[in-house]
């Protein structure tokens, strides 16, 4: 099977970066473009300014589905990330460009089953229990299909674009929940991402942005939220200011401008307003009381 415009494909690397255009990539981006991506090396190789360059739109995790809309002979595919709603950009999902080496054609006969989800911050898929690493850098929130039951602390799983089962430490995966999670459960997962570096467009425990943190925390529980903060606000329910609880969302906008930031509420009502967020200024995920200038731009409280 080959990639074809108008057909679905799946991500075959641990984390695939979605680019604004193929021409937007920089020399520093080579580790994120390699057929076997090395996102930690990419993050480590960028300076502070490069980490917030708008050439990156989003990121997709191993197994995520895309709709291929164009193929270029130089190894690039224009795609729509159908698991990342983006109503403001495309009703089908988040549009952008991926290297074709990061994709495999969707297989209608691919194994099915009750999914597992990666609960570890970072793990890897191996050729055999304790064997060579085949897919490094697999991150929290990645969904996998079990191939069989556990063996000596390892779990065989099917991975998109890779023949045969691969192996993951059994402790690194859990069954993907099917019900609505408690807000405190989601907040606890998000809190495990404290101090992860801020990467514009990041959606992984290697590097993340504000709306990526929200998207990923709920993805861990099988809940699909939009990718960008303004769409997240539209997709969630309003809560009166002063009645927010941990796990709700704060949204921020300057007068007359669209929403530009989101954070996860961490404090009960009646005290200081606090949130966990991927902070552009501090360049990392942190929990803090809302500074005065941030509080002045608080425009909405919403609940998933």
Each predicted region: which residue ranges?
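Mixed-charge, Lys/Arg-rich low-complexity intrinsically disordered regions
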Residues: 37-46, 233-241
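Residue-level "contact hotspot" at macromolecular interaction interfaces
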Residues: 59, 137, 240-243
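Active-site nucleophilic cysteine motif
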Residues: 190, 201-221, 226
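Boundary regions of SH3-family modules and the immediately adjacent low-complexity/disordered segments
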Residues: 1-33, 48-54, 58, 62-67, ...
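Low-complexity, Gly/Ser/Thr/Pro-rich intrinsically disordered linker/tail segments
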Residues: 293-304
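Loop/turn positions that initiate beta-strands
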Residues: 63, 135-146, 246-248
């Amino acid at each position: 099977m080959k990639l074809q415009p108008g057909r679905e494909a799946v991500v075959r690397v641990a984390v695939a970066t979605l680019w604004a255009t193929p021409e937007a990539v920089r020399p520093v981006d080579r580790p994120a473009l390699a057929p076997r991506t090395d996102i930690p090396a990419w993050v480590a190789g960028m300076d502070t300014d490069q980490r917030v360059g708008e050439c990156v739109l989003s990121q997709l995790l191993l197994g995520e589905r895309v709709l291929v809309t164009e193929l270029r002979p130089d190894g690039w595919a224009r795609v729509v990330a159908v698991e990342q709603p983006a109503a403001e950009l495309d009703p089908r999902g988040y549009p952008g460009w991926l290297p074709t080496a990061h994709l495999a054609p969707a297989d209608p006969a691919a194994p099915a089953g009750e999914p597992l989800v990666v609960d570890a911050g970072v793990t890897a898929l191996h050729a055999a229990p304790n064997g060579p690493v085949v897919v490094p850098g697999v991150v929290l929130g990645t969904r996998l299909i079990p191939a069989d039951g556990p063996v000596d602390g390892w779990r065989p799983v099917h991975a998109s674009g890779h023949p045969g089962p691969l192996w993951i430490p059994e402790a690194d995966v859990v069954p993907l929940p099917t019900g609505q999670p408690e807000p405190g459960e989601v907040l606890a997962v998000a809190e495990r991402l404290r101090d992860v570096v801020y990467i514009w467009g990041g959606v992984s425990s290697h590097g993340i942005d504000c709306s990526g943190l929200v998207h990923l925390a709920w993805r861990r529980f099988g809940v699909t939220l939009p990718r960008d903060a303004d769409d997240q606000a539209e997709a969630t329910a309003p809560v009166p200011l002063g009645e927010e609880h941990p796990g709700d969302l704060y949204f921020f906008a300057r007068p007359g401008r669209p929403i530009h930031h989101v954070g996860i509420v961490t404090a009960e009502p009646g005290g200081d307003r606090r949130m966990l967020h991927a902070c552009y200024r501090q360049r990392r995920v942190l929990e803090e009381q809302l500074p005065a200038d941030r509080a002045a731009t608080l425009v909405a409280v919403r609940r998933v």
